[in-house]
């Protein structure tokens, strides 16, 4: 089956932002104006197409990244309500991501497979904590982006304030390509700085848009920002810079070409404005997606590793061998869905592929593309496509699927560690099996959700990214798996690390009692590593003192020993273990003996290396009326918080601080009572920090160590 839309006319984009900036409403308007839906869905009515889980519709928040395919033809500048005559049609695959920090993995895995992002900002709130997190995630994967300043109809809307915040707080080269005409109730149109034309909205549903002259009172402002636009574009290209110096302006075609180049390279972030809820600015946003965000062929070829360890890249082309990344798993009444991004080649229904991450074959029995929770069966997925495979057996998030005859492993995605745990137990004995199945299914879908068993109490422990994350998962157990569970109080995910390096620590496991014995012997150095690195293993074995086949088992033993530290049984992080020496026995040595020796060496080294306890620190932003600021700051100090600054606008003060997670449980209730219900806060994980000695001693005593 031939490709219906050339790859150059495909856009894989995400819509990401802080919670309540209007991402889902923006997505709904995109679907409405592109003709995929004929009635506008609203988040607050629970009718949004992309919010299809029961909890999403009840809470008015997006939890999972819904993938949707739609089409768009550029508008006619002379008649902005209509498509441009003879203009080609583009395919746009959209992922609507959650803004709540507890669902950060959904944003992370979306960023990994997208080519471009619309970052939505609230015209009043501007750059908020989760905006910064989303921006960092987009930076991690070098995703080009455009900024859409939404809610221009809100009281206090200020486009240029958001422009300055993006430049200052996100350190991005934001360049307005539009200016709003009016604000709040008076927001009635947009000035297009590329075409130097105003567009006025004549009706409520944003379908009757008319070109108009630029308002007289805006001419100075428009001239100022047009000059900034031209200068920013000229700086992306030497030929344009020469033209700019010669003529002091650039043509519409030059500006569009320069903006596209600058956006794709990450040098420029074009800024647009509108009000998705009031149906203004969305068609121009879609035009900008087509004009400035990359197609799969505009981005660098995806890098991967061959079975022999050498690097290879795969271009976005149907002629290359097939390769794809599984970025999300989902179960529902129809079965298991594995969402994939095809990077190269063609995937056809009825064929076999290799899961190169696990070295297992998978049969492709059914392929679908999605309109939120509606599935459309297709016979194939091609390079650049986002789609889903039904019924894969062994594939999980981050796995590579590829052609059996051209194996490759693509770079996976960053998965943050959970910071909060609770104990769960079934309410009745009849629910025991159902609970186990439910937890397995949910953990398969969500890599930030972990399930473990406490060895001392035998309780089932679930861990996740925050209280809301775990609350929603427990809710899903009841709705989707019909399991009622009792949930314990939240527990902090502490960690352990070391403060000083130790060298040549021995681990020796010897058993000789008739017959074949056991012999494993390793010597390691242990040292602190950079914060955030987790665990690193290095082998400096030379001359075969430890044979190659025993180095892997020794590393495995060391890694497993890190899962339970020496102070209070919490995982050891941010350490580097180097295997420097050892010995073996021709007959008695075995993989198991070296695994045990590695574990013994790590435990002994950690005891000698001045171990210490770490706790998760949260980045907290509180918004309160000025009258309550003193109480809020006093409360943050009482919670062992570290103040980082505050600013006041329009009678509301934003207080920024870092606070230990252990001190933040129940804060939502406390902040409401301290501010007569007028204070709100957001928090997200920042980093791990050493626990003060007096508090650490109490935690260690409670856990009695885990020698």
UniProtKB/Swiss-Prot annotation:
Q: Which InterPro entries match?
A: EFG_II (IPR041095), EFG_III (IPR009022), EFG_III/V (IPR035647), EFG_IV (IPR047872), EFG_V (IPR035649), EFG_V-like (IPR000640), EFTu-like_2 (IPR004161), G_TR_CS (IPR031157)
- Highest taxon, organism lineage: Bacteria
User: Cross-referenced Pfam families, in alphabetical order?
Assistant: EFG_C, EFG_III, EFG_IV, GTP_EFTU, GTP_EFTU_D2
Gene Ontology molecular functions: GTP binding; GTPase activity; translation elongation factor activity
**A Gene Ontology biological process term:** ribosome disassembly
Q: Which UniProt keywords are listed? A: Cytoplasm, Elongation factor, GTP-binding, Nucleotide-binding, Protein biosynthesis
Q: Which GO terms describe its cellular component?
A: cytoplasm
Which compartment or compartments is the protein found in? Cytoplasm
Residues bound to GTP are: 17-24, 96-100, 150-153
Its protein name is Elongation factor G
Per the UniProt record, the lineage of the source organism begins with: Bacteria, Bacillati, Cyanobacteriota, Cyanophyceae, Synechococcales
